[in-house]
């Protein structure tokens, strides 16, 4: 159980992870998934309940305590150091040093290359992180987890900003970690991820534990019902809303280095979608429209 002022973020929940298992954690926004991860990684301390690893009770006062118990997390929003190299990001905090205290760069670059190649990825370890794609940055973070000998890896919405091809690459790496005996908590809103990778799935709703199922024994409709608390016959029912005149018109919107020649119009009563991968400029366009970016 975890409480914040005026909010119960976790209410007596339970979660069990087996060795070499991919266990999906699902629920709507606000269900308590992120709070549980922060408790497991030592960011928050629970008010009630216990955490056990291999049957032994542990108490995490901070993230170092969690890491010392072979737990690593890979978050949806990258936590890398963008202007440091791949090698520096992998080994930051546990660099190889000479007796004089100098960093053994050649040894670390070689080890980083070895880690990346073990995951089937040919990334130059001397490359700055800012020059990598989102998918490549996640692979570097997975390499960092492997380098720390993590036996429990938490992946928080790892496919949210990835293309179909990049998702397939992440699936391959995740399955490889599982085959090596690593236990993985996989958080995702995407049913495809869960049915493709997970052995079991646990659902939280309104900060409470709802249930745990073998993935091959729960249907998509049953899973959605567990998440929302009711039978869902239609996820997005169409409503007859008259579409009116143009409410917003954008023509040739340009901001050097961010976006170029963006044009569209939005009509009254219309839901207008603006989509693209991370870095495509979606947020910047909206900031430009709102006057936050000139």
Regions found by a protein language model. Give the residues of each.
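Glycine-rich phosphate-binding loops of nucleotide-dependent enzymes
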Residues: 1-294
């Amino acid at each position: 159980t975890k409480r914040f002022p005026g909010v119960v973020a976790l209410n007596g929940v339970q979660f069990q992870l087996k060795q070499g298992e991919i266990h999906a954690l699902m629920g709507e926004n606000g269900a308590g998934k992120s709070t549980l991860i922060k408790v497991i990684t030592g960011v928050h301390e629970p008010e009630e309940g216990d955490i056990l690893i291999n049957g032994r009770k542990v108490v995490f006062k901070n993230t170092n305590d969690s890491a010392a118990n072979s737990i690593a997390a890979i978050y949806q929003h990258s936590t890398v150091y963008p202007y440091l190299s791949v090698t520096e990001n992998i080994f930051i905090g546990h660099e190889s040093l000479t007796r004089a205290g100098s960093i053994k760069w050649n040894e670390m670059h070689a080890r980083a290359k070895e880690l990346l190649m073990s995951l089937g990825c040919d990334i130059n370890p001397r490359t700055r992180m800012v020059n990598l794609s989102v998918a490549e940055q996640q692979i570097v973070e997975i390499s960092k987890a492997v380098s720390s000998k993590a036996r429990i890896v938490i992946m928080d919405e790892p496919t949210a900003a990835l293309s179909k091809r990049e998702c397939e690459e992440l699936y391959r790496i995740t399955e490889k970690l599982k085959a090596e005996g690593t236990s993985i908590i996989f958080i995702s809103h995407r049913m495809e991820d869960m049915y493709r990778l997970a052995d079991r799935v646990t659902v939280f709703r309104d900060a409470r534990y709802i249930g745990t199922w073998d993935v091959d024994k729960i249907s998509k409709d049953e899973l959605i019902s567990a998440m929302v608390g009711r039978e869902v016959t239609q996820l997005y029912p169409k409503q007859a809303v008259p579409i009116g005149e143009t409410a917003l018109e954008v023509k040739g919107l340009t901001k050097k280095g961010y976006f170029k020649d963006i044009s569209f119009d939005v009509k009254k009563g219309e839901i207008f979608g603006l989509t693209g991968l991370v870095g495509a400029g979606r947020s910047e366009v909206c900031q430009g429209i709102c006057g936050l970016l000139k």
